[in-house]
């Protein structure tokens, strides 16, 4: 399993629209990607900061998505973001929700 962490600051006037756009425009693109497992969208109570965590079967799946589809998603996100979103990659070590993926490692 592999994870991507995208964080961004929302424009104040766009904060309420972003989760709706995420569900209608971004999530369908993610679901079509080979190796996509799950997405977690986190928004601060003030609705100014967003963290999106996507889980992938492999690092290669995440990298293919980043090369081939993320530029399209970035255009959508840029309508809502102040500044440039930050993208980080992680190797998940434990999850109570995705336990079977980690059991295979042991």
Report each predicted region and the residues it spans:
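Glycine-rich beta-strand-turn "strand-cap" elements at beta-sheet edges
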Residues: 1-2, 8-11, 40-47, 75-106
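Short, well-ordered beta-strand segments in beta-rich or mixed alpha/beta enzyme
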Residues: 3-8, 38-66
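Short, surface-exposed ligand-recognition loops at beta-strand->loop->(often short) alpha-helix junctions
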Residues: 9-22
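Intrinsically disordered, low-complexity acidic/polar segments
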Residues: 15-17, 63, 96
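An amphipathic, aromatic/His-enriched active-site/gating alpha helix that lines ligand/cofactor pockets
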Residues: 24-25, 30-37, 55-89
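Residues in and immediately flanking transmembrane alpha helices
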Residues: 51, 70-71, 104
